[in-house]
Amino acid sequence: MSPLGGKEGGRRRRQRAAGAMADGNADWMGSLPAALRSYPLSNLAIPGSHDSFSYWVDEKSPVGPDQATAIKRLARISLVKKIMKKWSVTQNLTFKEQLEGGIRYFDLRVSSKPGEIGQEIYFIHGLFGIKVWDGLMEINTFLEQHPKEVIFLDFNHFYAMDDSHHFFLINRIRSAFGSKLCCVECVEYVTLQYMWEKKHQVLIFYHYPLYREFSFLWPGNKMPAPWANTTNVHKLLQFLETTLEERSRYGTFHVSQAILTPRVKTIARHLVRGLKNTLVHRNLPMILNWVKAQKPGVMGVNIITSDFVELVDFAATVIALNDLLLEEDDSSSKS
């Protein structure tokens, strides 16, 4: 076996990718030109990750309640869980590594673990991931070290959770971030300058009615994330264009999900290859070219998410789009 074979090789490759991605991006918000600090965050270009927590999933745990009954039955066979892992994992980097690489929006799906005593909540995508609390602590440690960086946590799917689970999770969120949490405000008021003055760093979006009871939980409809649900990259890009044309009328943040979604037959045809080798690798260059052609602003992109954010220069490409806002300012001041 080569020195980079097996688990150890995979870990080294991931660390190299994370290191390369992190160069210059850990403090990118704090380093933006002064002119952009008064722009609404909804008008800036911000890199995000899809199923942000899925860098680790537990093959030994039961299949999650987000899966169909037939899948749960099949998953009693250990090989099935190994195959599920290949299609459930959409990121290689940990929260810390993603943050250091410039990712500021996190797509989060959570669940209780049926049969487990207590109210612990876990991340989930087919298989259970780490405890949500552990992820929040990892994120908070980064924020303590980078006080001018602002993040978006989008809790958009909940499984096997009643109100008591939600109250438990919401209290965990409050315990983790405390005064860093930004209370709900008009979207256009929320700028970097606003966040810095109030010493806020975290916006929580919570797609469940209990958000109304907590001033620091933003309603899910303030963070729409239209989903193309296609394996065809051309259809995806057309969908992204169409939904961008519609965003200005809503006065919200906006997520462009630059991701391809496997169908059942896609998985059946490419069982052991997994998501990365079947859909992501070959289509990322075209998706990245689409990103490079975008412009942030009221009529343009805001948050763009991707699978396997380290495979191409994704975060840096999205962040660089903000320079176009400066060019726009220059041209308007000269006219």
Where are the regions a protein language model picked out?
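Conserved, mostly hydrophobic/aromatic
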Residues: Q98, R109, L153, I204, ...
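A generic structural motif
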Residues: L153, K180-M195, T230-L237, Q257-A258, ...
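Eukaryotic endomembrane system proteins
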Residues: N156-F158, S164-I173, L210
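Aromatic-lined glycan-binding groove of carbohydrate-active enzymes
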Residues: E197-T278
